[in-house]
Amino acid sequence: MTSPLLAIRGLRAAYGNIEALKGIDLDVQRGEIVALIGANGAGKSTLMMTIFGRPRARSGEILFDGEDITHTPTHELARLRIAQSPEGRRIFPRMSVAENLQMGADAAEASESEHAADLERVLTLFPRLKERLTQRGGTLSGGEQQMLAIGRALMSRPRLLMLDEPSLGLAPLITRQIFDAIRTLNQTDGLTVLIVEQNANHALKLAHRGYVMVNGLITMSGVANELLERPEIRTAYLEGGRH
């Protein structure tokens, strides 16, 4: 079996004296979608942020395509074509949709024709953005801002796309549209995706494999559709939890 595109081994991180990650092991193979689910405060977003050096790992290692990136500066991760759509979207509200997308493209080493093809791809995935190219990002709806955040990440031509709570605060219809776009990218382009989500139902239906995090620990992992059928998952995250 080939080595994972992303391999996390024994990762620990903390905020002051509070340990947020307690020895995390996680793999993402090339061409797969992996979902990391768990309740609010479980440490999911902290894991995503630790990959980008905020907070810094106290111990353990993060390997990308076999290269140790545990302490690699954030700007260097773009060179490796690791892209993130962070929780809360964090678009540039005063910039137009087109300018936001260009910010993502600036991180990619691509020709003009490749940039044009990338832009057309994003606008095909998210037609709403095409209608609003000259509109300021801050005037978009929440769902449109999420589409823009993902589109900006895609413009950097990522080998690994990391999505942090992409369904947060969105209507079910918009969530389905966004998850359908992610599925399309994976199926047609082979894009590798790590998605952090409280919405276990959507995330596990999208993913090939899943991990469950509780209080900074991975407590369960496996094939996504098998995790969906486990009674403890259904009780905690589907029937009695957020769905």
Residue ranges, per PLM feature:
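Glycine-rich phosphate-binding loops of nucleotide-dependent enzymes
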Residues: T2-H243
